Amino acid sequence: YWMASEDHDFEEIQSFLFKGKKIQWNSEQEGRAVGTIQLDDLDPVLDLFEQHLGSKPSAETLKKWIAISYRNSSNLAEATRKFVHFLFQDYSLVVVDANDFNLKKLFVPAMAMELKNQKCFESVATQTQNIKKTYNEKFVPQVNPRPINLFYLTSKDRYLIRKEENHYYLEDSDKKLSEKEMLNELEEHPERFSPNVLMRPLYQETILPNVGYIGGGGELAYWFQLNHFFEMHNIPFPILVLRNSALLLSEKTAQKLNRLDISTKDCFLPRVNLINKKIRQISNIDLDLGFLKKQLEKQFGYLEGLVAQTDPSFEGALKAQLAKQNKGIEALEKRLLQAQKRKLKDQVQRMTDLHKEIFPNDALQERQLNVVEFYLDHGGEFINALMKVLDPFSNEFSVIKY
């Protein structure tokens, strides 16, 4: 497990949803590498969270590990490592915190090349053009490279590095170093340098080479920009694997789907489309007026023949009239459907509620629900069950009933 402890986007991790309620950690430590954030001001958030956990045995286990992880760690990286170990303690999971002097030492040659020659910018720009030329000229890169794709870290902040002529500047500070001073700083204190989002993959594969890299769609999008950069550094580029996605359906939810005769495939339709489809299926009248359009086409086909024999200038008016009649039929069809939905409002409401249950806030569960909600109900067996059924090399969206 690669712990992104050098990421700076605190906003992305400072809150989570639990049973529909937002729990947020407000801290003044923003702007620094998130792994180094201290936990002194986290206790009120943990107290609030634990109030919602209840008193089940699984809840007491969670409280114990929250205390071990988040109440007894010096920073967020240490706490995260402990909690991930708790979740996957039976699976020999390797946790890598790359914000480390010895690991950074291995990456000094690549960082020195970046400082001196700015090769990341050049190679990523070249690869982006290759993608546009070979696959899609409208391709929009997920990430745009900077001239220097490294940050300089301090205990409280991180700074972009800018090079002008023979000197390096830390943006938003008055620090200025010559090339020799900057390279000496890198050699003596590699832990003070941090790769940005484009150089981080190279760092990752330098210290822990992988046959494959598993990531989300957004992550893979910028990895596609990097194979030329990897070649430049003689680092093997891994096979890119899209991570699993799954929908978890409880037995109760599955029964609701069966009662409404909704397939799991139809669950993924937009809510309006799903409801319209089911209303058409369960109605005792045919709401499809497509047959009227076909009749119109036949009748106007006859008129087209007359126009061709008399005055072809009427052809435009004829086509306009056909379009007008078709729009009228479509409007009538929509009104019939709306009337039927009002008549079957109980079924519409049940389908609406069920769809909201499956896709909270109109989003995938993985974007809204917290793993703790499932752990409370099933304990550690929840993780074990997922490990058994998820196939990392399946190219399908999994629907798991539990």
Residue ranges and their predicted role:
Residues 1-9, 238:
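Glycine-rich phosphate/pyrophosphate-binding loops
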Residues 8-17, 107-111:
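Short acidic, glycine/serine/threonine-rich loops at helix termini
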Residues 10-16, 248-281:
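A structural-propensity feature for long, helix-poor, extended segments
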Residues 16-44:
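A glycine-rich helix N-cap at a beta->alpha junction
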Residues 46-69:
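Residues forming anionic-ligand binding surfaces in small-molecule and nucleic-acid pockets
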Residues 65-70, 203-212, 333-337, 401-402:
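Glycine- and acidic
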Residues 83-177, 181, 273, 277-402:
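Long, compositionally biased intrinsically disordered regions
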Residues 141-211, 217-228, 237-239, 244-252, ...:
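A translation/RNA-centric and nucleic-acid-associated enzymatic feature enriched
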